[in-house]
Swiss-Prot record:
This is NADH dehydrogenase-like protein YjlD. The lineage of its organism: Bacteria, Bacillati, Bacillota, Bacilli, Bacillales. GO terms for molecular function: oxidoreductase activity. Its EC number is 1.6.99.-. Its cofactor is FAD. It comes from Bacillus subtilis (strain 168). Induction: By glucose starvation. Transmembrane segments: none annotated. Keywords: FAD, Flavoprotein, Oxidoreductase. PANTHER family: 64 KDA MITOCHONDRIAL NADH DEHYDROGENASE (EUROFUNG), APOPTOSIS-INDUCING FACTOR 1. It comes from the Bacteria. Belongs to the NADH dehydrogenase family. InterPro entries: FAD/NAD-bd_sf, FAD/NAD-binding_dom, NADH-Q_oxidoreductase. It holds the Pfam family Pyr_redox_2.
Amino acid sequence: MSKHIVILGAGYGGVLSALTVRKHYTKEQARVTVVNKYPTHQIITELHRLAAGNVSEKAVAMPLEKLFKGKDIDLKIAEVSSFSVDKKEVALADGSTLTYDALVVGLGSVTAYFGIPGLEENSMVLKSAADANKVFQHVEDRVREYSKTKNEADATILIGGGGLTGVELVGELADIMPNLAKKYGVDHKEIKLKLVEAGPKILPVLPDDLIERATASLEKRGVEFLTGLPVTNVEGNVIDLKDGSKVVANTFVWTGGVQGNPLVGESGLEVNRGRATVNDFLQSTSHEDVFVAGDSAVYFGPDGRPYPPTAQIAWQMGELIGYNLFAYLEGKTLETFKPVNSGTLASLGRKDAVAIIGANSTPLKGLPASLMKEASNVRYLTHIKGLFSLAY
């Protein structure tokens, strides 16, 4: 009897699960259904470039139909309303219901606002290609407006959060600002680019010397860092910081935190802080017919600490899940997850970057790190046969 595998989410984990399981099952042996909110697979690690207008949307959002062409994968573009792992049912926003023999949950994360009053209502985010387009359009509109009104709030751009997303976004904006300002007859030095971070330093995943290098590189291009200053309240365009100071900014992009998709916590799966706990085979610890990938999962390393929810980990999870789905449904031996951390890369605009690479965490900076960042994207796209996106 044909098995039915349902995959929720077409991020890194979902796409790799779908492509990999098809290497082991013919369409007669198993139906594979992928459900995704958007018709595209979005390269989340490159969204900052789209948010600064530095690449076309087609370079970071690939049509799933094209990726899955000839793979016998049923694609449903729909939002998941809920899923119940006890009933083995998935309810979609269009009113339809799916049942499954095995389920993959790859629903990613949602923005965390930490209960800060007014933050969600008064900030933009960078979680999708649509968000990135909105940020770029908004920044350009404000610069244009500033050229007419000289309202300082229009000339102030605040990024909340000094992790990879926030730093990479501010780096891209610093790069484009001279030309964007010039386009509207504005002196780019009048545009204030600020980044606020609750912790004592930006990019805490990197060693101190690379953090200093990144800070200096961005400060040289006009970025002001406000570290050790949690946002406490947001009202309209006024952002209050812990030391009592205020930033008045008509552009505020919040990248300061993510949390598991709430649907995961409501599904009946065993969770830890909103993410599903998994065993060494990436099966849910409570439901062996459910596999979990990427930001939806929490996987603890040998040191007892959870692995960071990165794209490279999600990609590796997806590949293993693709095989383990087959092994589970056929009663074969499942393989254990052995993640390889190939490093952390932070771009600082177009021509600069900092990185630690490989098992020995070799530091890289400047052009070599930039090229490595580019290469890691190309490597991923080649892997999923998505190189056509680079034609744009």
